[in-house]
A protein has these predicted regions:
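A short, contiguous, amphipathic alpha-helix enriched in charged residues
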Residues: 22-37
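Short conserved beta-strand and strand-loop elements enriched in small hydrophobics
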Residues: 33-43, 87
């Protein structure tokens, strides 16, 4: 199953008060183009593979394949069929500043992984299925 979406939405304040600034992933993406697709941020719970990462004016856009040959990929496939469509980034903040409201503006992030989740911290961090090999879903 091929999916794509926004893993991080620039300038959207998430549930924790963080707001990712445009360009926050630039250095991280220069260092690596390979980050795991995890199930709910669980280390080792590989659900698939991300094949594309791109910073756009909207945020960090991703594309990847859910691998139903893997246990967490099968679980993800089942949950996606029930409406799961959230994405969440795992990261280490490199540069940030606090805002007067107590939240953080995240200026530079070291991306670690992108997870499939039910309830993303950033409401706009969502994906959609763009291709499936399961003919039952197409019919």
């Amino acid at each position: 199953m091929l999916i794509e979406g926004l893993a991080s939405v620039f300038l959207e304040t998430d549930q924790s008060g963080d707001r990712v600034r445009p360009g926050a992933f630039a250095e991280s993406l220069k260092r690596s183009r390979s980050f795991p697709m995890l199930w709910r941020h669980r280390p080792g719970a590989i659900a698939g593979v991300w094949t594309r990462f791109c910073e756009t004016g909207r945020g960090l856009e991703v594309r990847g394949m859910v691998d139903t040959a893997k246990p967490y990929g099968r679980l993800a496939d089942q949950e996606i069929s029930r409406g799961l469509n959230g994405l969440s980034i795992g990261f280490r903040p490199q540069r940030w500043r606090f805002r007067p409201d107590g939240g953080r503006d995240l200026i530079e992030l070291d991306l670690v992984e992108v997870s499939l989740v039910r309830d993303p911290m950033a409401n706009g961090a969502r994906f959609r299925v763009i291709e499936t090999s399961d003919l039952r879903r197409v019919a």
